[in-house]
Structures are given as structure tokens and as C-alpha cells.
Swiss-Prot record:
It is a multi-pass membrane protein. It comes from the Eukaryota. It is an enzyme of class 7 (translocase). This is NAD(P)H-quinone oxidoreductase subunit 4L, chloroplastic.
Length: 101
């Protein structure tokens, strides 16, 4: 694939995720948008690693590291959302005022 096409696709994914993260009022949707942003960043890492230096796997290794961190972030985020839903019966961001007290 051509470098520009992959970068444009990655930019679209990043902007869709950023828009969803800013406009979302649901915690689960915000976590999904954050994962979309991280996947766009991973796409850039792999693309630049493949395009500029085929012999080294620095971009691919960093991409695997980001995937592992994103999996941990998703697990912890969903556990927090589950706990907030159990206590507040809502997953809306503006209704979770647990840290304000």
C-alpha cells in the first residue's frame, strides 16, 4: 500500500476516535474511542517502521507494547465502569461524581 493512503486512513481513524472521545457522554463509548485512537497510533508505528527501515522491528515491537498497555487499560477501565454502574446505575460521564467528594 502507498504510504500516503495508510497515513490518511490512520488520520481518519485518529480523528474519529478523538471526536468520539470529546463528544461521548457514555464511559464505554469513550473507552472504545480511546482504543480507536491507540489503533490509529499503532497503524502509524507499523507503517513508518515498514516504510523507513525494513530490517529492524522497532515500530512493530513498540506496537505490541502499546497493544499490551491498551489491553490492560481496557480491562481496568471496564472494571471501573462496572463498579460505577453497580453503585450509580448509570454509565454517563457527567453523572459519575465519585471523585468530587
Amino acid at each position: 500500500m502507498i504510504l500516503e493512503h495508510v497515513l490518511v486512513l490512520s488520520a481518519y481513524l485518529f480523528l474519529i476516535g478523538l471526536y468520539g472521545l470529546i463528544m461521548s457522554r457514555n464511559m464505554v463509548r469513550a473507552l472504545m474511542c480511546l482504543e480507536l485512537i491507540l489503533n490509529a497510533v499503532n497503524m502509524n508505528f507499523v507503517t513508518f517502521s515498514d516504510f523507513f527501515d525494513n530490517s529492524q522491528l522497532k515500530g512493530d515491537i513498540f506496537c505490541i507494547f502499546v497493544i499490551a498497555i491498551a489491553a490492560a487499560e481496557a480491562a481496568i477501565g471496564l472494571a471501573i465502569v462496572s463498579s460505577i454502574y453497580r453503585n450509580r446505575k448509570s454509565t454517563r460521564i457527567n453523572q459519575s461524581t465519585l471523585l468530587n467528594k
